[in-house]
C-alpha cells in the first residue's frame, strides 16, 4: 500500500491545559470535572516570554474553519535533543506523480525543516457528504482515506467557509496524523487547536505560506513498503479508553459530575453557548425514588441558568428492547417536539417551546438493557461509558441519572438527523436503574422522583416501540389545555402494518389490527362519552400531574397505583395480585372516583400511535394472559367499589352516566366469564342445524357425520387446552398451541358456512315469509346482519373502513382461539404474577465506587478527552456494524409459585364446572334442529346485537359532540358575526349554539 510522506520534523506532544476558569472547581460547582476538548485552545501565541505563556487558555472558537497557514509539521519534541536523521532529498516536489526511479525518503521525521510550496486553499471547507447517509458522524481522517465510511458532517449554520485570511488561519484546527490511522485526535501543534484543512494524501506540507507554482508533473512519487506486522492486530484507529483516579468533591454528600461531550459530537452542534449542550451531567442516586427531592437531588431544569418551568414531561419506559425499537420511538418524539416549536402563534409554545418539554427515558435494570440501545443513547450524547459507579461512600447506587440537551436524533434506520431536518434541542433525562424492578417501579421514579422535582403540568407515558404521529403529542396535550376537568387522555393505538401492509399477510397481525380498530371505533368513544375510560393504554396516554396527587392523608390515585409494587408473596391475595397486573386500569378508576373531585377521562381521536403487535403465537398468548387477567380482576374491583362515585363532586347527570356504564360493564363481564360455553353452544346449534336431512347440503347424511366429528374434536380440543395451559409455557409448546388455533379455525369455518347456508336457504325459499317474529329469519338473519352491519356502518362513519376488507376474515376465523386458547390460558395461569425481583438484590461492584472522607471522594474516570472520544467512536461503530447481542438465558420460576398454584386449582375448577353445567343443561333442553324455536340461541344473538347497538349509540354521540365542538370553536376563531337582516333571531341562534357547546363540554 502507498504510505504518506513523513513530516519534515519530529512531532510535538503537548499536555492539555486545565487552567480554564470555567473548568476548575468552584464553590458553586465543586464537583465539576471537565476534560479539555480539542476545541479549547490551550496555547496562546501572543507572548513568547516564558514557557508557561503557551499554556494560557484561549477563548473557545465558535466556528469550524480549516486552517490555511498551519502546516502539518509538528513542533519540536518534548525530548531535549531531536534524534539525528538524514535530511530528505532536495528534489522533492509536492503534488507530482510518483515513479519507481525516485529516491527513497527516510521513514522517520527529519531534524531539519525543508521549505516546500504550499497548495492553494480549498474553497470547500467540508466534504460534500450527507451526514444522514451514514449511521455515524464523520471524522477528519475521512479526508485522507483513513475511513471512507465516516464522512464529515455538513458545515454548522454559524460557519463561514469563505473566511481564509491569516487572521483566522489557526481558528478551530487540529493536527491529523497521516499514518492511515482512524485516530483523529492527535497531538496539537503550536499553531492550531483544532482540525486543519486536509491536503493531498501523498504530501506533507511545511509551514511555508507560498502558493503552489511548480509544475505538478515534476513531482516524483516515492513508494514505501515495510514488513507485515506479526500476530493479531487490533482495528486501526481504535484506542482502548484509559482510566485514571481523580478526586472530586461531593455536592450535598452526593456524586454529581459534569462531563464534556465527545469531540466528534461537539464538532457538528449548531448551539454551543450553554453547558447543557457541551456537558453531560451524571448523578449517582443512592436513595429511594420517594426520597429523591428530600435528599437534595436536583435536575438541570431547577438549577442555575437552565432553570425552567416544565409544561410537558414525557416518560419512555424500556426493558431489553433493541436500538431499532428505541430509535423508532425517540425520533418520533423529537419530531413532535419540533411540531410544538413550529406553532409560532401559540401562547404556550413557539420557537423556544423545547425548553418546556423534558423527555425522561427509564430503563428497567442495568444488566437488562440492550447494549445497542446504550450505543444509540451514547451517540445522542446522553450516555458515556465509564462514568457510573456502584456505590458512593459505601451507599449502594439505586439509579444512574444522565442529563443532556441533545441536538441530534437517530431515526429507525440509524441515520443522524439534525437541525437541517428540523430537529430542535431536546432536554433528555436517562435513568438507568441498577436493578430490574418492573415497569411499575419505573413509573414511581418518573412520578415521585423526577415529577416531584420538575412539577410538570401534563405527563405523557410511552412504551419503547410505539411511534406517535408527527403531531399526536400536541393533540394529546391540547385535550388538557381546552378542558380543565380532564385528568387523563389517550390516543388511538394502531397496529404496525409494515410496508404496503405486508404485515397483514400474517393472520395474527391482521386479527389484532381488526380488534384494535373496533376498540377505537366502538369502545373508546362510548367510554369517553360517559367520562370513564376503563383503561388508558400505557403505550400512549397522558395524565394531569395535579390530578394524580394524593390528598393530605396520603390516599389518592398514585398511592393506589403504586400499591401493587409493595405486594409480595402470601401477603397479597391472588385477586389483588392479578388486579395489579393491569395497574393502569386501577389508576383510571381512582382518578374518576377521587373524593371531592370531578375528573373525567377523554379519548383523543386525532392522537395516533403505531406499535408492533406480536406476530408469533407464544408472544401473543403471553401478552394476552396479563391483559385478560388484569382486565377481569380490575373490572370486578371497579364494580365492587362503585359507591365511591357518590363521594365525588361529579354532577348528577355525570353520575347517572357512570352508573349506566357500570351496568354495561357488568353485562360485558358476564359474557366474558361464560364466553367458553357460549362459543360451544353457538357452534352446537348453528353447525348442528345441518344434521337435518331436509337441510343437509351434502346429502346422504354427510352433514350429520361432519358435525359429529367436529363436535367431539371441539370438546377434546377444549380439554387439551386446559392441560396445555396448566402444564406448558407457550414458548415450550409452540407447535401444540399453533395446531390448536388451526383446528379452531377449521371449526369456525364450518360454523360460518352453516350459518351462511341457512341464511341463503331461508332467503331463497318460496314458502318462507320474512315477517319479524319468532322464526329463523328474525333470530338468525336479522341479529347477525345487524351485528356485522353495524361494524361496517360505524367504520364508514369514521372514514376508516379498510380493516373490514383486509382483516375481518382473519379476525372471525381466529375468534374461537381468542375465546378458548387465550381465556383458558389466562385463567389457568392466575398464579403467574411476575414480580421481576427474584435474585436481583445483590449489590454489583463491576463499575467501582466513589470512596473518600468528608466531601471529597476518589474515583476512576476517563483520563482525558481522548478516552471519552474513544468510547463514543466505539458506540458509533457498533451501531454501524449492527453487532449482534447474544440472548439471555431463561429466568427461573418466580417466588411463591406453590402458593399461587394451589389457589389456581380452585379458580380453574370453579370456572370449568360453571361453563360445563351451562353447556350441558342448554344442550339437553334444546335439540339441534329447531333453530327458530331455540330461546337460548335467540337470547345470545339478540344480546350481542343489543350490545353492538349500544356501543354504536355511544360512538355516534361522541362523533356528534366533536362536530358541535368544531362548529363552536370555528365560530369563535373566525369571529363570525350574524348578519344584520336576521335581527334578534340571529343572536338567539348564536346564544343557543354557545350554550349547547358549553353544556356538552361540561
UniProtKB/Swiss-Prot annotation:
Family designation: Belongs to the chitin synthase family. Class II subfamily.
Positions annotated as glycosylated: 123, 336
Protein's UniProt keywords contain Magnesium: no
Gene assigned in the entry: ChsII
Record has ATP-binding as a keyword: no
MF GO annotations: chitin synthase activity
EC number: 2.4.1.16
A Pfam family assignment: Chitin_synth_1
Catalytic activity as recorded in UniProt: [(1->4)-N-acetyl-beta-D-glucosaminyl](n) + UDP-N-acetyl-alpha-D-glucosamine = [(1->4)-N-acetyl-beta-D-glucosaminyl](n+1) + UDP + H(+)
Main subcellular location of this protein, as a coarse class: membrane
InterPro entries per record: Chitin_synth (IPR004835), Chitin_synth_fun (IPR004834), Chitin_synth_N (IPR013616)
Membrane topology: Multi-pass membrane protein
Summary of the tissues where the protein is detected: Expressed in hyphal bodies.
UniProt enzyme class: transferase
Lineage: Eukaryota, Fungi, Dikarya, Ascomycota, Pezizomycotina
PANTHER family: CHITIN SYNTHASE (PTHR22914), CHITIN SYNTHASE 2 (PTHR22914:SF38)
Purpose: Polymerizes chitin, a structural polymer of the cell wall and septum, by transferring the sugar moiety of UDP-GlcNAc to the non-reducing end of the growing chitin polymer. Contributes to the production of conidia and the ability of fungal conidia to germinate. Involved in fungal stress tolerances.
Superkingdom field: Eukaryota
Gene Ontology cellular component list: cell septum; cellular bud neck; plasma membrane
Name of the protein in question: Chitin synthase II
Record localization: Cell membrane
Disruption-associated phenotype: Leads to increased germination.
Transmembrane segments: 627-647, 669-689, 704-724, 740-760, 780-800, 808-828, 906-926, 940-960
Keyword line: Cell membrane, Glycoprotein, Glycosyltransferase, Membrane, Transferase, Transmembrane, Transmembrane helix
Amino acid at each position: 500500500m502507498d504510505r504518506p510522506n513523513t513530516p519534515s520534523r519530529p512531532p510535538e506532544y503537548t499536555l492539555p491545559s486545565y487552567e480554564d476558569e470555567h473548568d476548575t472547581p468552584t464553590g458553586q460547582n465543586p464537583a465539576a470535572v471537565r476534560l479539555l476538548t480539542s476545541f479549547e485552545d490551550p496555547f496562546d501565541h501572543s507572548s513568547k516570554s516564558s514557557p508557561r505563556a503557551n499554556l494560557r487558555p484561549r477563548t473557545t472558537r465558535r466556528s469550524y474553519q480549516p486552517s490555511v497557514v498551519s502546516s502539518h509539521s509538528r513542533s519540536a519534541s518534548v525530548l531535549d535533543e531531536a534524534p539525528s536523521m538524514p535530511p530528505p532529498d532536495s528534489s522533492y516536489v509536492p503534488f507530482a506523480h510518483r515513479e519507481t526511479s525516485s529516491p527513497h525518503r527516510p521513514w522517520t521525521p527529519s531534524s531539519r525543516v525543508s521549505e516546500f510550496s504550499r497548495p492553494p486553499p480549498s474553497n470547500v471547507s467540508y466534504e460534500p457528504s450527507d451526514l444522514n447517509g451514514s449511521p455515524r458522524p464523520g471524522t477528519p481522517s475521512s479526508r485522507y482515506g483513513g475511513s471512507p465510511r465516516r464522512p464529515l458532517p455538513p458545515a454548522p449554520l454559524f460557519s463561514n467557509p469563505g473566511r481564509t485570511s491569516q487572521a483566522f488561519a489557526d481558528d478551530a484546527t487540529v493536527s491529523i496524523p497521516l499514518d492511515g490511522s482512524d485516530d483523529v485526535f492527535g497531538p496539537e501543534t503550536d499553531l492550531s487547536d483544532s482540525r486543519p484543512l486536509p491536503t493531498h494524501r501523498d504530501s506533507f506540507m511545511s509551514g511555508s505560506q507560498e502558493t503552489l507554482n511548480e509544475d505538478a508533473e515534476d513531482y516524483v512519487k516515492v513508494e514505501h513498503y515495510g514488513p507485515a506486522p506479526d500476530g493479531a492486530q487490533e482495528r486501526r484507529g481504535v484506542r482502548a479508553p484509559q482510566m485514571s483516579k481523580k478526586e472530586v468533591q461531593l455536592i450535598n454528600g452526593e456524586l454529581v459530575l459534569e462531563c464534556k461531550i465527545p469531540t466528534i459530537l461537539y464538532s457538528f452542534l449548531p448551539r454551543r453557548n450553554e453547558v447543557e449542550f457541551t456537558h453531560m451531567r451524571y448523578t449517582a442516586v443512592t436513595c429511594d425514588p420517594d426520597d429523591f427531592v428530600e435528599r437534595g437531588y436536583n435536575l438541570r431544569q431547577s438549577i442555575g441558568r437552565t432553570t425552567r418551568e416544565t409544561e410537558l414531561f414525557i416518560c419512555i419506559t424500556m426493558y431489553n428492547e433493541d436500538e431499532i425499537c428505541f430509535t423508532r420511538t425517540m425520533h418520533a418524539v423529537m419530531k413532535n417536539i419540533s411540531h410544538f416549536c413550529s406553532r409560532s402563534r401559540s401562547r404556550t409554545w413557539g420557537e423556544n417551546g423545547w425548553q418546556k418539554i423534558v423527555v425522561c427515558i427509564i430503563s428497567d435494570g442495568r444488566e437488562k438493557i440492550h447494549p445497542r440501545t446504550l450505543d444509540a443513547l451514547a451517540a445522542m450524547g446522553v450516555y458515556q461509558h465509564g462514568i457510573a459507579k456502584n456505590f458512593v461512600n459505601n451507599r449502594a447506587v439505586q439509579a444512574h441519572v444522565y442529563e443532556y440537551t441533545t441536538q441530534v436524533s437517530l431515526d429507525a434506520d440509524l441515520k443522524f438527523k439534525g437541525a437541517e431536518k428540523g430537529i430542535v434541542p431536546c432536554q433528555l433525562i436517562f435513568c438507568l436503574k441498577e436493578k430490574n424492578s418492573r415497569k411499575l417501579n419505573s413509573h414511581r421514579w418518573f412520578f415521585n422522583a423526577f415529577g416531584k422535582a420538575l412539577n410538570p403540568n401534563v405527563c405523557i407515558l410511552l412504551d419503547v416501540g410505539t411511534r406517535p404521529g408527527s403531531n399526536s403529542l400536541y393533540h394529546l396535550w391540547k385535550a388538557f389545555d381546552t378542558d380543565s376537568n380532564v385528568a387523563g387522555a389517550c390516543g388511538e393505538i394502531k397496529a404496525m402494518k409494515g410496508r404496503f401492509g405486508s404485515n397483514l399477510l400474517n393472520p395474527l397481525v391482521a386479527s389484532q389490527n381488526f380488534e384494535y380498530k373496533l376498540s377505537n371505533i366502538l369502545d373508546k368513544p362510548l367510554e369517553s362519552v360517559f367520562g370513564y375510560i376503563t383503561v388508558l393504554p400505557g403505550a400512549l396516554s397522558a395524565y394531569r400531574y395535579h390530578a394524580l396527587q394524593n390528598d393530605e392523608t396520603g390516599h389518592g390515585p398514585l398511592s393506589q397505583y403504586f400499591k401493587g409494587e409493595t405486594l409480595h408473596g402470601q401477603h397479597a391475595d391472588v385477586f389483588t395480585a392479578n388486579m395489579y397486573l393491569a395497574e393502569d386500569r386501577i389508576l383510571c378508576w381512582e382518578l374518576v372516583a377521587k373524593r371531592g373531585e370531578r375528573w373525567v377521562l377523554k379519548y383523543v381521536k386525532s392522537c395516533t400511535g403505531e406499535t408492533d403487535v406480536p406476530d408469533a403465537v407464544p408472544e401473543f398468548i403471553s401478552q394476552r394472559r396479563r391483559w385478560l387477567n388484569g382486565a377481569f380482576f380490575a373490572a370486578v374491583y371497579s364494580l365492587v367499589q362503585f359507591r365511591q362515585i357518590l363521594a365525588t363532586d361529579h354532577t348528577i347527570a355525570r353520575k347517572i352516566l357512570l352508573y349506566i356504564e357500570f351496568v354495561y360493564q357488568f353485562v360485558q363481564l358476564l359474557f366474558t366469564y361464560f364466553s367458553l360455553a357460549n362459543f360451544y353452544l353457538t357452534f352446537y346449534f348453528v353447525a348442528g342445524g345441518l344434521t337435518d336431512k331436509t337441510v343437509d347440503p351434502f346429502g346422504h347424511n354427510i352433514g350429520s357425520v361432519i358435525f359429529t366429528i367436529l363436535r367431539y374434536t371441539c370438546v377434546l380440543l377444549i380439554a387439551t387446552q386446559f392441560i396445555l395451559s396448566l402444564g406448558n409455557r407457550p414458548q415450550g409448546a409452540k407447535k401444540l398451541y399453533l395446531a390448536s388455533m388451526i383446528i379452531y379455525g377449521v371449526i369456525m369455518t364450518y360454523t360460518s358456512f352453516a350459518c351462511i347456508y341457512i341464511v341463503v336457504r331461508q332467503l331463497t325459499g318460496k314458502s318462507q315469509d320474512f315477517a319479524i317474529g319468532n322464526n329463523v329469519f328474525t333470530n338468525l338473519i336479522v341479529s347477525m346482519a345487524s351485528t356485522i352491519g353495524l361494524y361496517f356502518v360505524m367504520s364508514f362513519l369514521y372514514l376508516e373502513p379498510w380493516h373490514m376488507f383486509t382483516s375481518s376474515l382473519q379476525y372471525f376465523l381466529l375468534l374461537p382461539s381468542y375465546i378458548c386458547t387465550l381465556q383458558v390460558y389466562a385463567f389457568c395461569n392466575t398464579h403467574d404474577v411476575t414480580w421481576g425481583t427474584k435474585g436481583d438484590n445483590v449489590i454489583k461492584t463491576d463499575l467501582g465506587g466513589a470512596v473518600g472522607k468528608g466531601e471529597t471522594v476518589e474515583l476512576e474516570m476517563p483520563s482525558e478527552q481522548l478516552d471519552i472520544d474513544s468510547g463514543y467512536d466505539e458506540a458509533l461503530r457498533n451501531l454501524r456494524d449492527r453487532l449482534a447481542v447474544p440472548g439471555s438465558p431463561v429466568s427461573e420460576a418466580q417466588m411463591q409459585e406453590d402458593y399461587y398454584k394451589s389457589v389456581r386449582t380452585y379458580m380453574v375448577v370453579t370456572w370449568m364446572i360453571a361453563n360445563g353445567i351451562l353447556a350441558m343443561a342448554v344442550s339437553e333442553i334444546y335439540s339441534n334442529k329447531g333453530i327458530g324455536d331455540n330461546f337460548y340461541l335467540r337470547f345470545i344473538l339478540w344480546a350481542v346485537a343489543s350490545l353492538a347497538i349500544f356501543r354504536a349509540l355511544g360512538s355516534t354521540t361522541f362523533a356528534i359532540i366533536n362536530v358541535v365542538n368544531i362548529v363552536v370553536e370555528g365560530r369563535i376563531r373566525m369571529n363570525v358575526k350574524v348578519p344584520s337582516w336576521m335581527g334578534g333571531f340571529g343572536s338567539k341562534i348564536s346564544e343557543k349554539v354557545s350554550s349547547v357547546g358549553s353544556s356538552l363540554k361540561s
